[in-house]
From Swiss-Prot:
Primary subcellular site in the record, as a coarse category: cytoplasm
A Pfam family that the UniProt record links to this protein: RuvC
A GO molecular-function annotation: DNA binding
Cofactor: how and how many bound: Binds 2 Mg(2+) ion per subunit.
Gene, per the UniProt record: ruvC
Binding sites annotated in the UniProt record for Mg(2+) 2: E67
Compartments it resides in: Cytoplasm
Signal peptide segment: none
Swiss-Prot/TrEMBL keywords: Cytoplasm, DNA damage, DNA recombination, DNA repair, DNA-binding, Endonuclease, Hydrolase, Magnesium, Metal-binding, Nuclease
Swiss-Prot/TrEMBL catalytic activity: Endonucleolytic cleavage at a junction such as a reciprocal single-stranded crossover between two homologous DNA duplexes (Holliday junction)
Protein's name in the database: Crossover junction endodeoxyribonuclease RuvC
Database matches in HAMAP family: RuvC
């Protein structure tokens, strides 16, 4: 049994999802959103860092999947998103978690079967795979999808890939 944390980073809303990977598949543990409000950027990044640190403390995951930054039309938004990712990655690294990064299309492919799936399709598959009866918040759904993608990818990489990544500093880029 392995606890996996998925993070959908954002400078205003960061989604999180925790799943338990067992021999029979994945089970839902927890999900939600870290809301940073409208303060200064450094204050919002601190909230993301502390929020992710608290989730790790509460649930005890051993590995984390996080979405990669995509280059948006607005460079300022992409920069802020990258900084929020950094805050979450540092929180996970401080706790000793293995960290893997996934593109949005990789997550969609792993969960919905196509890299072009929309958010609603991804959410429906997350609900089906984790046997959820209520729709999670959209950012939490995305984070659960990232956790499921990471669980699927870990299953195909173990033992070689993650052991190699651990020797190289704990960061696995897929």
């Amino acid at each position: 049994m392995t606890l996996i944390l998925g993070i959908d980073p954002g400078s205003r809303i960061t989604g999180f999802g925790v799943v338990r990977q067992t021999a029979r598949g994945c089970e839902y543990v927890a999900s939600g959103c870290i809301r940073t409000g409208g303060g200064e950027l450094h204050e919002r990044l601190q909230i993301v860092f502390r929020g992710v640190s608290e989730i790790i403390r509460q649930h005890g995951p051993v590995t984390m999947g996080i979405e990669r930054v995509f280059m948006a039309r607005n460079a300022d938004s992409a920069l802020k998103l990258g900084q929020a990712r950094g805050a979450a990655i540092v929180a996970a690294a401080e706790a000793g978690l293995e960290i893997a990064e996934y593109s949005a299309s990789q997550v969609k492919q792993a969960v919905a079967g196509t890299g072009g799936a929309n958010k609603e399709q991804v959410m429906m598959m997350v609900m089906h795979l984790l046997k959820l009866t209520q729709k999670p918040q959209i950012d939490a759904s995305d984070a659960l999808a990232i956790a499921l993608c990471h669980a699927h990818t870990r299953s195909s990489l173990i033992p070689h890939g993650l052991a190699t990544a651990r020797r190289r500093g704990g960061r696995l880029r897929l």
